[in-house]
């Protein structure tokens, strides 16, 4: 859960410890979802290529992702984890500041990427919300 992740990060003593942990998260997540690497799933605003696809199951959203860099995979994994299992209205309520605990450890470019990932997820849910 996100609370467990927050508590893990809170205990880190250095930026290197955070980076190493995020790389490990990235390495262990993101099953090989190359099949989602199509234009409509591509996240604009990230310095590395990232694709996120949403699937709605019984009114709740679940997000899959693909990136070919471990660090980015770690970030997108955590962002998707924070949005998985939410309704479209709940996804719409998520703010960048909900991830301050993660963003505080990122460079400016990576923070922009985090915002772009979150915007992409929100747009997926919003598009569905306005289509009903």
Predicted regions: what they are:
Residues 55-69, 80-83:
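Conserved interaction-surface patches within small, structured recognition/assembly domains
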Residues 70-91:
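Hydrophobic/aromatic-rich, well-ordered segments within soluble, folded domains that form packed cores
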Residues 2, 6, 57-64, 75:
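Mobile acidic interaction elements
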Residues 1-36:
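Extended low-complexity intrinsically disordered regions
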Residues 26, 82-83, 121, 125:
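Generic structural signal for hydrophobic core residues of well-folded globular domains
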Residues 33-55, 64:
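Structured beta-strand/loop patches that form or line metal/cofactor-binding pockets in enzymes
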Residues 67, 89-94, 99-132:
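C-terminal binding/interaction regions
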Residues 11-15, 66-71, 109:
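Structural motif
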